[in-house]
From Swiss-Prot:
Pfam families: DNA_pol_B, DNA_pol_B_exo1. InterPro entries: DNA-dir_DNA_pol_B, DNA-dir_DNA_pol_B_CS, DNA-dir_DNA_pol_B_exonuc, DNA-dir_DNA_pol_B_multi_dom, DNA/RNA_pol_sf, DNA_pol_B_thumb, DNA_pol_palm_dom_sf, DNA_pol_type-B. This is DNA polymerase. Its main location: host cell. One of its GO terms (cellular component) is host cell nucleus. Its EC number is 2.7.7.7. It comes from Guinea pig cytomegalovirus (strain 22122). It is an enzyme of class 2 (transferase).
Amino acid sequence: MSAPVFFNPYLCGGAARRRNGCSTVDSRRGNGPTKKGKKSFLQVVPRGVIYDGEKGLIKKVTQHPPRMFYNNVQYLLEPQMSWPTLPCRETCRVGCGREQPLRFHTFDQIDSTVYADSVEQIFLGYRRHVVPCGNVIRMFGRTCDGSSVCVNVFGQPSYFYCEYDGSEGYLDNYLSTVLKETEDVTKIVFTLDAQRVHKYSLFGYNTKYIENLYRVTLNNWPVCKRLAQNLQSRGLRVYEAGVDPVARFCVDRKIPSFGWCVIKRFYARSSGLASFCDIEIDCEIGDVEADDSDMSWPEYRCASFDIECMSGGDRFPDSSMVDDIVIQISVICYAVGRSGAESDGVSGAEAAVREHQHLFTLGPCAPIPGTHVYEFPSEYELLLGFFIFFKAYSPDILTGYNINLFDIKYLLQRMEKIYHANVSEFTKLRFGGRFSIYVPVGNKPRNASSASIKVHCTGTVVLDMYPVCVAKTSAPNYKLETMAEMYLNEHKDDLSYKEIPPTFLANDNGRAVVGRYCIKDALLVKRLFEKLNYHYEAASVARLARIPLRSVIFEGQQIRIYSCILEEAGERNMILPSFLTAKRPGELATESSPVASFEEDSEQTSDSSLGEVSSQGSSDGGVGYQGATVLEPDVGFYDTPVAVFDFASLYPSIIMRHNLCYSTYLPLGRDDGLSDDDVFLLEFDDGTRYGFVREHVRKSILGELLARWLAKRKSVRKVLAECQDEVEKLILDKYQLALKVTCNAFYGFTGVSSGMMPCLPIAAAITRIGRDMLMSVVDYVNTYMGHAEFWLRYLGEEDLTGDALNVKVIYGDTDSVFVICGGVKCGSVLEHGEAIAGHITRALFREPIKLEFEKVFVNLMMICKKRYVGRIYGQTKLSMKGIELVRKTACEYVKSTVRNVLNMIFFEDDVSAGAVELSRMTMDDVKRHGVPSGFYRIVEALSNARDELYLNRVDVKKLVLSASLSQEVSAYKQQNLPHLRVIQRLAARREELPSVGDRVPYVLIAPPPGSSKNVPNYEISEDPGYVIEHKLPVNGEKYFEHVVKTVTNVLGPIIPKDCARKEKFLSYVLPQRVYVSRPFMPYACAANELVVACDDGGVMMGVYGIKPVMCGVSVTN
């Protein structure tokens, strides 16, 4: 029997469906006759959805109209159709803005270039702004009642500044000449105007306007951008070249990019609409006003989705291959923004779409409780149905897990490359919309949270939870299963990657199993979204910096600070230079700042950190400076109180206290008529000197921004403490966090040489002043706090232990100092720590610099720079930094073993006393007397760990190591790495491969018999799932070496100082173990030896000595 050429699920869905039959509904809008087009498309459908269990695909080009089936009803698929499970959307009618203003909340903005011949019905009074063309800003948002809004704002020009020595008339001719020589511009219409203006440069202290400065204005942003770049390449000095119309509008008019706005004068469109929103209006830039008093949200629509694919072969699905089809898409629709009390007033239609589940599937599918199941005859119809649903539901936020790199990319490539469909028609704009993904060529992301991959969907903000989890979590891997277990204590459905195709092809019930799996993934992402609340955090940053929410998600830290400085400088009649050339040694950093671009598709490098610069300084372009100070620690185990003091907001307070700024920097050697009292001068060890004018001469823009934000944060936290509404509390908390993070990012903004406005003098001054402050605290503590008179100012005699006072700094790191407080009771240090910190602050510093008391350790293991572990007074958990317990690479078993050892040292008095005693011994003492009895517990714990590893008693899941895949496998110069070998093995077995940015898990297995003892790790690395499935033995020796190495690194301070090879010390003190197979048991047993049966049929013999140090290690397998 030949296969059918067109698939209808209701012709092969069982007797019940044939009895019930199915009707056909033309779901297209309007009641008139529909036009029967002859457009053909390719139908691709798995044979298994027709013939249960069969493999392969059926392909046919058909001219039948696309369709879907829902509840035994057939629907014809049209872009404008009303979706059967969503309420019908009706365009709201509003007046012309004269009777009642329109108040709406905006969350997304784009700029469009509109021409005079546009089909849009533009109000006659605004048409002058688009003749011959003009920038139109489209603001998307929602009203209080949940109606979607598109506000078309007219009249925003594009402009930049440039210096030109010739006459004003000649400049027009020169600009015209440049434009004629600019590629792709000669056929575009625009208007151009150049006017002489008087502005100051932000860079460097100056009292004179920039000479020969012109403001170049165009009504076409793409042309404006190209012209500015061309002028820069010709050597002209250009200012603010990359600031787009949206940034101009928000900054110049003080309009929030995420917040409430009011429009008192507008025109409501009734036809010639540009969007699919419920309300669409036109207005001018002067008609939009900010309503900053209200920080609440309306109810925004969200959608969490996931896709399932099936490869035509035995490889991982590739979207460019016709046979690698999408078989299912799940969507969870829900709302965010309002609290329960606030949402009571939401309309019934809006409430109906608040939360529900949808599944789009190929072929017939058994019902899934609580889920709308849509069945499609082919992949194209499934994809078309999903995009039509996306357009009908019109989500404001789209989320998923790893959707930037996989799901969205896969769907777009299938629609565009395989089926040649235009996906931009499914955005919120009727024309001119974009639905695209941007992956820069040749740019290797440092990690999965990199902003190098950008997704643009007009009117919808895409928020991938995968990079959010990577940025906020330290985990061995970042699979959805791991994150769900960590944050939600939930798990994915138990269905492996290999089981999906046969289960899907089995029958209707099998497709329901895969459907539930797909829905569960989307549901877990939705719960992660609500658990982490990153959307509130990103929205707070967008509100603060006046940049679109999508820029917060995709553009990193630099653009946020740039926008804030742009606004503040504008209020002082200052402008920001733009540069294309790379920084040259010895030049002011401002001479090399790259173009500050607000473009969606800009390839600029942006800093994604919180603003920290390494102590090595910059290495880009030959410019460097010494970074933050880290003092050499006094290594050791301290069983006396150790107080930790740190500076509150160190770098921001330095900027404010010393008036550091681009605008206050004074190039030395320039005669500005300033006295010595007017200048703050810094001189470095190499003779370099930097000067900044003091506050009475000119106030620092950076300092005023920081002071305002820190004061705002203080007031927000005060309101937060009194707030009762949970949603409002969350918004306020994220806002104060945004203020804190943005303040801390200023140093990184000035210090990152590849950033938008690096300035070596500012960054070097900040770190130098920070070092001086740290050293002044160290000197003060060591000079004055070692005397009883100092402590008796705050303490009584009963607060001292009676032992000799031993107070000194044992470690200093950037903004923190660790002070040993020997002879003082721990509780007393805690009680009076703030008072002591205040005393030091008053003695050494002036506001706003402040030293604070952070915590006190009961005991502390200081290992080396950046590495320590200790027990904080009053807490039951250890505080640690830099050791394997907080690293992603270590396996869980090593972590648990080290944690057990540390807990014994810090929480068991006899072990702690033994550790102190051991640290005071020499190797001769150990050989003569053995290790202290308190240390026997650690020896026993390590011996037990060795037994568990050698006898294969450890769960393989606890032995999983991992490494990050930072680039494509082929790009690695060194191929003999464990995680790369695992990927090669996965590829050979045609299994699912990790993506760039993922952490690749692996297990070290036992080598083949006869292999070298020192077999490289890459030769014995294997995928954990494969190890478990095939019950492969692990390499106990390798893992125990890792345990011993890690414990040695942590316990280094208590190992006798004269031990020549500390890594061998534990091998000296551990009892001997010999592991033999069971057949040798009668020959291996001695009278005084302990024999234990092994799980694998072997036995373990152990020899214990009274002095364990005398027993060496001898192991045979």
